[in-house]
């Protein structure tokens, strides 16, 4: 039964290639250029090309994903071979349309998360990982077989950065397994295990040789376990009630945000209607002006307009490219790690002469794809190692329980003092305890499912809100552009109106013209003031929404961290409680045995003392009789001699009894000393375990510090990118100003320079908004 259960658990994680293929095929626009990279005519013989790098480069260039052929499997037993043959076989170099995922893979995709952030990945331990790879490659024969098949392992794109786990051969199992002794954190093995691996002695548990005694792990008493369960159930209920209250608060916040979004939509619709009315009025004015200004059409103005439109189009194209590059770079930097300095220096394959190609210098072209693949492989290996460790511990526990049951049955057979009624009562109590355990586990599973469902619903709502915010921002940008164009057209119309005034002095009266112009100016001022007020209100609402979005993201992250911490605390408390209960019961049994031994020794000594007193009384009585006989009858010497002989024999018997009592007392004292030594050894073991746990905590703290350093480096790179984009925008602005000033100096400079400057300032404002929104988006996940 144990082997079948283990094989069923292992079959879920056979092929991890299904989780990696969609990531390469989903990307809409790859960062790698379409043209293939230049190949050197004489490649170096030390570092041949990797099949993995070629496959990934082909997928990025053509868009057709290719399945990577599986490596040669290591030696397994018959049970593993049979389980592998039952699984599906992936043909080498098959497309993703031919690869259909299984339900097991779907369940695993549902369980696992996307990609870990910088806080959970320990990227700082790369040098330790490389040293472990070199040491484990010397010890294991299977790894050497893979290296012979794959060629040289020094290629950067072919060497995976995942931890290779040493093989530990179990004695009782039928097949070989990779067992990594990991305490809580899969990337940080403890120091004592490293010393054992260097000496060549792996920590193997011989299940047949080491038989724990009955007194080490007895079954827990029902009273203690019931009280502990009641306490834990009360604690968990309180925590879940607090989480429910927080969920209600978040739901209320989401409802208020939806109401505000609806109001924003209504305001945007009203603004669109007003803009449509303004456009209609402007069209009418344009038609009237065209009818009047057909005679005064100038080709220079048309040429300048074309140039300005071309510059605006080029500026928009550059903005879009910069935005896309920023988005792609932020996505890679949030999901994948950077190359270290040593890795970036050790990149070979560049031509020895001539300029260096740009597709090998930049981080965002090819290396992130390989690093992402290696990170996924690391995660899968760590998951396999943790599952194997859990299965080993489960097997050990089951075997211990079986041994304890066998010993208990033997004791029951030996001491048949237990009646059938007491045995039935014990069985009923055990059944009740098992039913209570099942009910509690079901309740915990239901609560965890509810928490997961609520978390997914919140994530969906947050994604919807972010999409709506993006749409609103895009609409506002479009409306701002339209407003800028309308203002430029209004200024052009004003200039034309002034020219028409000079031409048509005698046609229209000055007073009538002034009144019309004043009315138009007042209308324009009113409309501009209304638009400014509406724009200020919209900007204030957008800032409020962004602040609320940040607060919601922070609250969501805090809630997820609290849930994880609570789950970890529950597991730790349960483990500690189990261990303490087992230790208490073992100590109780040992104390009871010691008390029984002491009582038996006391009874034996009391019996010996009573015998000695009886013998002394008999001796005294005989001495009195002898004196009386000597005083009364001097002739009865023979009887006195016989009585003396009897007294000597009795004294010898008393001496023998005393010697036996002394020997038994020595045995009892020797046993007590042995028990004290056993207790001292156990205390030393517990102290070693405490030191080991302290060291593991130190390792985890170092990993967290390294993750924080990487986050700071990421922020520095983002600041550099922002400065570069700001400089490019400034350069484009200066070019626009120079071109517009050159072209506008000849005819009517005031009428042309002002609209161009207004357009540039508003474009700069749009650029600033884009950069601010990008900064918010890039810093939001890091928080």
Swiss-Prot record:
It is found in: Cytoplasm, Cytosol; Cytoplasm, Cytoskeleton, Microtubule organizing center, Centrosome; Cytoplasm, Cytoskeleton, Spindle pole; Cytoplasm, Cytoskeleton, Microtubule organizing center, Centrosome, Centriole. Its main location: cytoplasm. Residues 94-107 have a biased composition (Polar residues). It comes from the Eukaryota. Residues 34-45 have a biased composition (Pro residues). The keyword rRNA-binding does not apply. Residues 139-155, 196-214 have a biased composition (Basic and acidic residues). The keyword Transferase does not apply. InterPro entries: CEP89. The modification Phosphoserine is found at residue 50. Keywords: Cilium biogenesis/degradation, Coiled coil, Cytoplasm, Cytoskeleton, Mitochondrion, Phosphoprotein. It is linked to Homozygous deletion comprising CEP89 and SLC7A9 genes has been reported in a patient with isolated complex IV deficiency, intellectual disability and multisystemic problems that include cystinuria, cataract, broad based walking pattern and deafness. Required for ciliogenesis. Also plays a role in mitochondrial metabolism where it may modulate complex IV activity. This is Centrosomal protein of 89 kDa. It comes from Homo sapiens. The gene is CEP89.
